[in-house]
Amino acid sequence: SCNCVCGFCCSCSP
């Protein structure tokens, strides 16, 4: 599930 605020689907904080 993409729930990040990096611009797109990323793994900043799962």
Swiss-Prot record:
<feature type="cross-link" description="Thiazole-4-carboxylic acid (Cys-Cys)">
    <location>
        <begin position="9"/>
        <end position="10"/>
    </location>
</feature>
<keyword id="KW-0883">Thioether bond</keyword>
<feature type="cross-link" description="5-(methoxymethyl)thiazole-4-carboxylic acid (Val-Cys)">
    <location>
        <begin position="5"/>
        <end position="6"/>
    </location>
</feature>
<feature type="cross-link" description="Thiazole-4-carboxylic acid (Ser-Cys)">
    <location>
        <begin position="11"/>
        <end position="12"/>
    </location>
</feature>
<feature type="cross-link" description="5-methylthiazole-4-carboxylic acid (Asn-Cys)">
    <location>
        <begin position="3"/>
        <end position="4"/>
    </location>
</feature>
<dbReference type="GO" id="GO:0031640">
    <property type="term" value="P:killing of cells of another organism"/>
</dbReference>
<feature type="cross-link" description="Thiazole-4-carboxylic acid (Ser-Cys)">
    <location>
        <begin position="1"/>
        <end position="2"/>
    </location>
</feature>
<dbReference type="GO" id="GO:0042742">
    <property type="term" value="P:defense response to bacterium"/>
</dbReference>
<protein>
    <recommendedName>
        <fullName>Thiocillin GE2270</fullName>
    </recommendedName>
</protein>
<feature type="cross-link" description="Oxazoline-4-carboxylic acid (Cys-Ser)">
    <location>
        <begin position="12"/>
        <end position="13"/>
    </location>
</feature>
<feature type="cross-link" description="Pyridine-2,5-dicarboxylic acid (Ser-Ser) (with C-10)">
    <location>
        <begin position="1"/>
        <end position="11"/>
    </location>
</feature>
<dbReference type="GO" id="GO:0005576">
    <property type="term" value="C:extracellular region"/>
</dbReference>
<comment type="similarity">
    <text>Belongs to the thiocillin family.</text>
</comment>
<feature type="cross-link" description="Thiazole-4-carboxylic acid (Phe-Cys)">
    <location>
        <begin position="8"/>
        <end position="9"/>
    </location>
</feature>
<feature type="modified residue" description="3-hydroxyphenylalanine">
    <location>
        <position position="8"/>
    </location>
</feature>
<feature type="cross-link" description="Pyridine-2,5-dicarboxylic acid (Ser-Cys) (with S-11)">
    <location>
        <begin position="1"/>
        <end position="10"/>
    </location>
</feature>
<keyword id="KW-0929">Antimicrobial</keyword>
<keyword id="KW-0488">Methylation</keyword>
<keyword id="KW-0379">Hydroxylation</keyword>
<keyword id="KW-0964">Secreted</keyword>
<feature type="modified residue" description="N4-methylasparagine">
    <location>
        <position position="3"/>
    </location>
</feature>
<comment type="function">
    <text>Has bacteriocidal activity against Gram-positive bacteria and a few Gram-negative bacteria. It is particularly active against anaerobes. Inhibits bacterial protein biosynthesis by preventing the formation of a stable complex between the elongation factor Tu (EF-Tu), GTP and tRNA, hindering the activation of EF-Tu.</text>
</comment>
<keyword id="KW-0027">Amidation</keyword>
<keyword id="KW-0078">Bacteriocin</keyword>
<keyword id="KW-0044">Antibiotic</keyword>
<feature type="modified residue" description="Proline amide">
    <location>
        <position position="14"/>
    </location>
</feature>
